[in-house]
Design a protein with these regions (language model features):
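Active-site anion-handling motifs in enzyme catalytic cores
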Residues: 1-281
């Protein structure tokens, strides 16, 4: 069996003639089971740290200085440690239609006020885990927050993050929502209940995926009530058949998104929702 992020990736591989491909999400999500996560005690933007990415900086620019900003990649390193903001300021100014000087001034002030760039992966991971809450523009920062039990909302901005949000039901907020409502409102309106309900199902699918591949597995389904009500082997097989069937359907327009494929994907999503309902029994 081959495991991929989500249904769109699985469908793409099926259409290339590759069989036994199923969605399992990101393996990093199975590094630690944190249990139920609730956004309690979040009272102001200062309670919410932001793993930095330019796309989220765009939507938080006017309140960016109210947040703890956590850098991650080489572009962040240039900004946080060397004060080289020209490239990011240009991106932000073009996106918002403001002057580069205004974007640069707000960006540099926010980073100087609350920016943190780690010396190592361990320092970065610890910093993520030490936060009261996270509004993340970074996928793996969000994952490492959730696996450490930190209430986390992910701002998805590409197919990669969208697939992970859909599969795990990660609490999420759109860039437009963050820009219009502000970080606190966007955070508090995110769906943590859906994520909490989905966790045991994802872990059950992961456990069965490893079992099907004869890979040693130290993880388990953390809610024992899941097992009697759902056969995860059958679920993986059903997903595989649905995606295989969908891969035979031809595109009906230039974008390659046919009505039949969309219907097949909706069927798959309904199956995932059905799994969640069964875990409630």
């Amino acid at each position: 069996w081959i495991g991929v992020r989500g249904a769109a990736s699985a469908l793409y591989l099926h259409r290339q003639g590759i069989e036994n491909v199923v969605p399992i999400g990101c393996p990093t999500m199975y590094s630690n089971f944190a249990g139920e996560i609730l956004p309690s005690g979040i009272e102001s933007p200062r309670d919410i740290a932001v793993p930095f990415h330019w796309s989220i900086a765009v939507n938080l620019l006017d309140e960016l200085c109210d947040h703890r900003l956590i850098g991650q990649d080489v572009m962040d390193e240039e900004l946080f440690l060397e004060n080289k903001s020209a490239r990011l300021s240009r991106n932000i100014s073009e996106h918002l239609g403001i002057s580069k000087n205004e974007a640069q001034s707000k960006l540099e002030y926010a980073v100087s006020s609350g920016g943190f760039f780690p010396e190592s992966y361990q320092a970065w991971y610890q910093e993520i885990g030490n936060q009261k809450a996270l509004l993340s523009g970074r996928l793996h920062a969000a994952i490492c927050g959730l696996t450490q039990g930190v209430p986390t909302v992910l701002s998805s901005w590409d197919i990669r993050t969208r697939e992970i949000v859909d599969y795990f039901k990660i609490p999420s907020a759109s860039g437009e929502q963050i820009r219009k409502e502000g970080s606190l409102s966007a955070f508090m309106n995110a769906d943590f209940e859906g994520f909490n309900e989905r966790q045991n199902v994802c872990w059950g699918r992961w456990s069965e995926f490893l079992n099907q591949n004869n890979i040693a597995n130290n993880s388990k389904v953390y809610d024992s009530s899941v097992g009697p009500f759902w056969n995860f082997k059958t679920e993986l097989q059903n997903d595989n058949e649905i995606l295989k069937t969908a891969s035979y359907l031809k595109s009906e327009n230039k974008s390659g998104q046919s009505r039949q494929i969309n219907r097949a994907l909706r069927v798959l999503k309904r199956g995932l929702k059905s799994t969640v309902r069964k875990t409630r029994l």
